[in-house]
């Protein structure tokens, strides 16, 4: 299990390229997602009345993300969806 705390995480530098899901373990804080075109999105994460997870952070679209506050998250590779016939 990989746990992340406050900091900036850059795909290809300190985080392998791929698609990831983030799950809040404790605390709360702001997740700032920066795309390759420098557009940003913000999501409040937390255990109380905030988003408890964020799925689908994709390095093909996102160049980095930042966690602020005292939030502690688990990051995991996103699972491939299996489509039934």
Placement of each model-derived feature along the sequence:
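Primarily secretory-pathway and cell-envelope proteins
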Residues: 1, 25-85
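A glycine-anchored, Pro-Gly-centered beta-turn/N-cap motif
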Residues: 5-11, 16-19
């Amino acid at each position: 299990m990989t746990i992340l705390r406050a900091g900036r995480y850059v795909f290809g530098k300190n985080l392998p390229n791929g698609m990831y899901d983030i799950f809040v373990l404790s605390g709360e804080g702001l997740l700032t997602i920066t795309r390759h075109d420098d557009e940003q999105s913000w999501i409040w994460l937390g255990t109380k009345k905030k988003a408890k997870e964020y799925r689908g952070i994709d390095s093909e679209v996102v160049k980095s993300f930042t966690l602020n506050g005292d939030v502690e998250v688990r990051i995991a590779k996103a699972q491939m969806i299996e489509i039934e016939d």
